[in-house]
Amino acid sequence: MFSKDGLNNLMQHAQKIQEQMKKIQQEVSEIEVTGESGAGAVKVTLIGSHYCKKIELDKNTILEHDKEILEDLITAAFNDAVRKISDLQKQKMSSISSEMKFSNNLNLPF
């Protein structure tokens, strides 16, 4: 059976983690990242919620590349930006993941 103090500590700990996760989610949603391809010829800027804010094309790229290559470059830049957001989310969430491992000082029977 849980002790009253142990259960209270567990609930406080869970609430603290939940608040930290909300804060991190808010921070990540406001982050801007730019993915690039073709040595910077194509740039895609996303915000943390994976919303595409801007696509930039180097004017020389438009003139030199055909439609299919340009589409591939845009796709690669977009995927690069999505990967960067994912990496940032993992990095920020790892800061609280260790707190999710409950320590012995919670007075829990397990």
Swiss-Prot record:
It is found in: Cytoplasm, Nucleoid. Transmembrane segments: none annotated. InterPro entries: YbaB-like_sf (IPR036894), YbaB/EbfC (IPR004401). GO terms for molecular function: DNA binding. SUPFAM superfamilies: YbaB-like. One of its GO terms (cellular component) is cytosol. Pfam families: YbaB_DNA_bd (PF02575). Its main location: cytoplasm. Keywords: Cytoplasm, DNA-binding. NCBIfam families: DNA_YbaB_EbfC (TIGR00103). Binds to DNA and alters its conformation. May be involved in regulation of gene expression, nucleoid organization and DNA protection. Belongs to the YbaB/EbfC family. Homodimer. This is Nucleoid-associated protein bbp_426. It comes from Buchnera aphidicola subsp. Baizongia pistaciae (strain Bp).
